[in-house]
Amino acid sequence: MLSIQIYTIREHTKTYEDALNALKKLKDLGYNSVQLAGNIEKLEYTAKAAKEVGLEVIGVLSNLVTVEENQDKLFEIMRYSGATDIGISADEVGDDAVEMIKRANAFCKIANANGFTFSYHNHSHEFIRGESGKRAIDYIIESFDGDLMPDTYWLQHGGVDVIKFIEDNAKKIKILHLKDMQRTVDGVTFSELGKGNMNIKGIIEKAKELGISNLVVEQDVCQGDSLKSAEISIDYLKGAL
């Protein structure tokens, strides 16, 4: 599955018409599926655009408040698009992860009852140790009833051995975000796959070995036009798969 998280090209998806044109370009580049992102309105019109151009929707990514407050509409969008996974990410949680997980588990039960999987997408703040000495990711791995949706860049940014994390948690991973990290004179930034310093090839090989088939290209910040970045990344991915 050659997938992309359309947050990557968000400047090209501000309206339905723009999204339609951008998703057509993604399909022409060789992508055959997408993961949607945004508020409920954006999820709705990008789902419509994806269906119009013939791109499979593997899932959506939003936040806990949005999915809690728009449950019925979200499930409608999921069924319309054929998507199967609902993902959330969170702002910094720290030791407050316990309360967040309680709410997430309540929604997970509802999502599962409606035929959908529910996943947590990490950034790097989950790897900061709180006053208890534990990291938010420890609470999430131990207590979250849903799946994990790891992000390779943010795992690396959090000081984690990316391949080991994927290996240790493989049973809970259905979707993996592929994102490269580039070193600059000012620190680190996002880059197209294969243009950074991460072992993306090794990560892909490990994912294949573990049966993780939903590999999703994502780039939070692009130095040039994001559609060009999407092209560079899929060309790399085609060669690596």
Model features per residue range: what roles?
Residues 44-61, 107, 111-116, 231-235:
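Short acidic, glycine/proline-enriched helix-loop-strand junctions
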Residues 224-241:
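C-terminal helical cap(s) of enzyme catalytic domains, especially alpha/beta-barrels
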Residues 2-6, 34-36, 57-62, 86-88, ...:
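Hydrophobic faces of well-ordered beta-strands that scaffold small-molecule active sites
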Residues 30, 54-56, 80-85, 143-148, ...:
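Glycine-enriched alpha-helix->loop->beta-strand junction motifs that scaffold or abut catalytic
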Residues 1-80, 84:
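N-terminal pre-domain/capping segments
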Residues 11-16, 33-46, 63-70, 91-98, ...:
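Acidic-and-aromatic substrate-binding clefts and catalytic sites of carbohydrate-active enzymes
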Residues 113-197:
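Acidic/histidine-rich catalytic cores of soluble enzymes
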Residues 17-21, 71-73, 99-105, 131-138, ...:
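Charged helix-capping and loop-helix junction motifs
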